[in-house]
Amino acid sequence: YSRLGQEEGGQILVGGTSEDHPVDDVPSAGAFLQPTVIGGLSPTSKTATEEIFGPVVTLHPFNDEDEAVEMANITEYGLAGSVWSKDPERGHAFAKRLDTGIVWVNTWLNRDLRTPFGGVKQSGVGREGGAWSLNFFSELTNICVKGP
């Protein structure tokens, strides 16, 4: 995604390579991508809208909350998001407008395992966690037996 971000007109602001190897030279022991920040991309670019499972973030300036919500919801994915605000109530109100399965306000990856987790739109396959797991990981079977 570092290369794609650049191809789409973005600029690597921080990171973008593995610690000891160029991105194309992945050793057999694996490679670890530095935390990467990409700026200057369109909010509709592939790098900005795909679900990247790695330490990559794209930055997008906005004029008001409505524009920020529009940019956040433009993706076809919706696993998780985070909102950072000096005003927790405002952050909570903003979070309600996001199309994601879980939203953290002024925190990240903080979840009670008894609560549901899972994405919306093209993210995930439903809810897991707590009672939701019983339905998600169970398959009901109706067995009818006629006695002797």
Locations of regions flagged by a protein language model:
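Alpha-helical packing segments of well-folded alpha/beta enzyme cores
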Residues: 1-2
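General beta-strand structural signal in soluble alpha/beta enzymes
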Residues: 12-15, 105-107
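Short, solvent-exposed loop/turn elements at beta->coil junctions and helix N-caps
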Residues: 16-25
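Conserved C-terminal structural/oligomerization subdomain of aldehyde/semialdehyde dehydrogenase
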Residues: 25-148
